[in-house]
Amino acid sequence: MKNFEILAPAGAEEQLKAAVRSGANAVYLGVDNFNARRNADNFTTDSLKEAVKYCRLRNVKVYVTLNTLVFDRELEELYKTVKEIARSGADAVIVQDFATVRALKEICPQMPLHGSTQMAVHNVSGAKLLEEKGFSRIVLARELSLEEMKAIRKEVGTELEVFVHGAHCMSASGNCYLSAMLGERSGNRGLCAQGCRLNWKNRHNREYALSLKDMSYLDRINSLMKIGIDSFKIEGRMKRPEYVAAAVDSLKKAMENQVYDKTALRSVFSRNGFTDGYLQGKRDVSMFGYRMKEDVTSAVGVLKDLESLYKNEIRPNKADAKLILEKDKPAVLFLSSKGATAKVTGEIPQEPRTAPLSEEIAFRNLSKLGDTPFFLDSLEFENPHGLTLPAAAVNALRREGANELENILGEKTYGIFDAQPPVFSDRETAEKPKTRIRLQRFSQYSEDFEKADLLILPLDEILKNIEKIECLPVKIAAELPALIYPEDEDEVLKKLAKIKKSGIVRGVTGNIGGIHLLKKAGFRILGSHGLNITNSLSAEAYGAMGLSDITLSFELSEKALKNISSDIPRGAYIYGYLPIMLMRACPQKSENGCLDCTGNTVLTDRKGIDFPFLCHNKKYGVLHNSVPLYTGDKNLRNLDFVTFFFTVESKKECEKIYDAYLNNKIPEGRKTNGLLSRELL
């Protein structure tokens, strides 16, 4: 029978113990920086070693999260952190950034790699790419339905992990820039400010339009087991130990077809109940909810009862003891478990004043293993001369023996290499970068754009206007949809084959699945902002994958942008209403679905500011910043090209903005430098 894994969050030591004692098979945790929950208490590199030891002795695996984006200035610290994680003996590392992948492969090639949900694997192609890169496990995107997970499971051999309980991000994982753009705290760097939980209103004036209920798939866990998902993950490294215990206990019971306490699970934490909308493919208004006063107060009544789930230490390991007492020699205790044996010596036994030490009394004293992970199963007792040993001396042997056995069993070693991050040198580029034009609609096209080096249009927009487009005197690139689910992959390949016949051989993608699809179609691959490239190692990694050029993340400051150096040509956005959230559950839907929706609407924040919201073929929606980026007045050295990212603008507005740049003028109207003048935390 397949062994399924319950994977629990451990934001700190107490949560870790709650997870283990409640029945988790594995925990995931973060150390200091470089993890997606930097505001959790987390673990130091020293406490990590103790955490790994504690878990290993209780047959629980530890996965360390290094699932954030890294800047060049942090590469040295990243390499040091990777070495400490390898020394701890952790069972795997969960990663997002390909710089972290490189560091792990150079320092500890034996360490298993798990692809974080931040890598946005939502199709077969993305899973295959990570499988080819040597990942042993992939954490699938939260937005997938059961049938979509099944399709991925059918095509890849790597382990698959799925979130089954906890908070739902409104955005597709790895594609949210809301927190960063509105402040200095990036979700891609573990410091999400949860701006989506504030009171956003949609076109129907419905409040909290970006706040989803927490997910709970426990009632459908057998369906996930049936399709072959390997690991069931609970979200919640920021939550209290009672929550962790309740979630683990409930999941365990659900997997064993037992009744679990739904009321307690909802009371300890929820946002007006739970949803399984994504799993069922029912992405409607019932998925939305926010944390109400009664959700907060209901937790108080269940916390005390939930403590009982993790109050007592578990002792899963059978131990066998052998105690030898001989004249004029120190007492010897052998303590064995799981194929390992500890040997300790103690006091010299004495002639008894009354009665010798009996096997029964020795067993009783040696059985008091307390907070250790062992229980005494048998004792082999040798006392040929009828000697005695004080209870305190027997207890000391027991403590030392258990401690030594813990040290032996709790250790796991990897081969570790003393690798260092490479030193990069600046690469000279053209005095003024080449320009690219990205249009949302072909109706925005102007002859002025023939001065650009490249024109980018959505794949479907090219197909609608193929006869006109194939006659244009400018190079064309097809932008793949930002989200391509398993049921759409073959259709995308067919569309690429059609435009290839018209001479279009360049494709733009911001997702690793898109890279795999474009390779399969025989296209030149241009990486966009969605790849989240924030350092030189990541840039090199995408170059090694065969990309022709890359657009760097717009979460980079001007200084960080200039620090990136690699052989692959690179660019950045110079203008545009930046896409700050990519979502599959539509916030604009009403009880009547998409009725009367044009697909070009706005969402309004609590200050009354409107943010453009564009629907893409009813497959997904994109929230754009309320103010357009413009950095044409900055000295963007070290870039090969800059891209004008046009979305909601009219043709005339597009012309004016591009013309202003070409004539060294600043376009009229409100604009922002974005994060170019700010350094993210």
Go through each PLM region and give its residues.
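Active-site pocket-lining/capping segments in soluble small-molecule metabolic enzymes
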Residues: 2-121, 139-143, 147-233, 238-541, ...
